[in-house]
């Protein structure tokens, strides 16, 4: 168990770096660019209850929310993998993907199906299909 936890922390760190590179951090809530309203977003891409127009966070709040959220997304990735092997880097990328598309979408995606089948190159190519 200790080894698994250590691996999860490493994968979460990788995911956090990926998310920080792609998302950027905004400390004042902003509307969804597509709808001009809900869902309002703040920090490193956080949405949900309490995030609305006028909400302002500190950097510590944004970083803390990301860290908390990633623990849940990591659990969703482990479940989606269903025991299939994954390196820390692969898990980190999958956690980052789950953060953006949700664990349900990841679990039913061609990306995860290819990974579970051992087609790692095919799985890697699937990331680009989600780039909108």
Q: What do these predicted regions represent?
A:
Residues 1-132:
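Cell-wall polysaccharide-cleaving catalytic domain and substrate-binding groove, primarily
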């Amino acid at each position: 168990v200790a080894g698994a936890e250590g691996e999860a922390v490493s994968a979460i760190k990788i995911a956090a770096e990926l998310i920080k590179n792609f998302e950027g951090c905004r400390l004042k809530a902003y509307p969804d660019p597509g709808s001009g309203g809900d869902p309002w977003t703040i920090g490193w891409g956080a949405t949900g209850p309490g995030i609305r127009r006028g909400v302002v966070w500190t950097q510590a709040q944004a970083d803390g929310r990301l860290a908390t959220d990633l623990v849940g997304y990591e659990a969703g990735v482990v479940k989606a993998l269903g025991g299939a092997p994954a390196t820390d880097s692969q898990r980190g990328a999958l956690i980052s993907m789950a953060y953006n598309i949700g664990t349900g979408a990841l679990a039913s995606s061609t990306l995860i199906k290819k990974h579970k089948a051992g087609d790692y190159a095919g799985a890697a190519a699937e990331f680009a299909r989600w780039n909108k």
